[in-house]
Amino acid sequence: MNTTILSEDKRDALQEIVNIGMGAAGASLAEVLGAFVELAVPRIDVVDRRRVPLLLDTGAWSDGEIEAVRQPFFGGIIGESLMLFDGAEPARLADLLGHAAAPTVEEQQELLLDLANVVIGACVGGIAEPLEEVVSFAPPSRLGGRPDASAFVVGDPEQGREALVINVDFKLEERRFRGRVLVFLSEPSLVRIDDAIHRFLNALAS
């Protein structure tokens, strides 16, 4: 398979669907944190799986330790989600979520997982729902340090040579909180999404 599997019209349609999904994620995050969320325009690419680790470069907004939460999803479409934070951010989560007392390290990590669960669920659900695909989620888990995408995105030959990657940066400017959401879809799911977009466009035209 090559990247032309998604025609220009279908890629444009997917971009609009992703924009809506990320908008829902921003609304969920704003509701949890009680602050306006600024979302960058999502980037969508079909890439060779060997290039996926390059997408984890967070040098544009963090040159220090990175906290990452991973959450696989499965069902009509199968993939992985990552939520990346500057390593200093978990210490601020208690204040962001309205906790008066200083949390323990374990409590900070629980807050991080809870937050990622909300945002990742909104992102993936916002993409799957318009395409009438049902997805379920595995429990989120924390990855220490800078995550190695090759460990779970590149290394499985059964998932094909290409992956669809949805990448969006977000920040709460007044709360000094920023991060990145990455959604990885394997080649078999890319074929299914192509079919789902075709049905979606036909429904709009009817």
Feature annotation, model-predicted:
Residues 2-206:
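Composition-driven recognition of glycine/serine/threonine/acidic- and proline-rich low-complexity segments
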